């Protein structure tokens, strides 16, 4: 009721810190079924917030939703397994970083660009531990930026359904 109606589109970017490949073993323990149990308070809070995000999305069954998180541990979580997932690479949307990123969406035909391959010329090489790519960016705001072309694509495909 605070919104003045229901949203047509929902975009969610839950905190990736405890799901990231770089910090996953600091925050999580792999269970027998593949789920990643929290072992830090930060990870437990991240799971609560992410699950609340999914609950809020469920309040609006007619909305198109997109949930974004860099490819990593979130895709292993039990609570996200029933959501359709796609993986994009930021370089295919004009960024100089490859940054494989998972997008969960109920859009019937999101038509995301195919992922590029490691070593392709469309992105800067960023081997683990290097100072290039996302890991070379100094602040969270810069590391979290979503390419404009990907945002424009999401707007376009959402408008096709909502209009």
Task: Provide a role label for each language-model segment.
Residues 1-163:
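Conserved active-site and SAM-binding loop architecture
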């Amino acid at each position: 009721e605070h919104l003045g109606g229901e949203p047509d589109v929902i975009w969610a970017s839950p905190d990736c810190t405890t799901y990231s490949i770089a910090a996953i073993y600091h925050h999580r323990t792999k269970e027998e079924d593949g789920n990643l149990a929290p072992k830090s308070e930060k990870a437990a809070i991240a799971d609560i917030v992410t699950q609340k995000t999914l609950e809020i999305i469920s309040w609006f069954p007619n909305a198109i939703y997109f949930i974004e998180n860099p490819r990593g541990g979130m895709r292993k979580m039990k609570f996200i397994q029933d959501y359709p997932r796609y993986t994009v690479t930021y370089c295919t949307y004009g960024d100089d970083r490859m940054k494989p990123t998972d997008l969960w969406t109920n859009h019937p035909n999101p038509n995301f660009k195919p992922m590029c391959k490691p070593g392709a010329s469309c992105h800067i090489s960023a081997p683990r531990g290097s100072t290039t790519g996302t890991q070379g960016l100094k602040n969270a705001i810069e590391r979290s930026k979503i390419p404009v072309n990907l945002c424009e694509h999401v707007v376009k495909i959402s408008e096709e359904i909502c209009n």
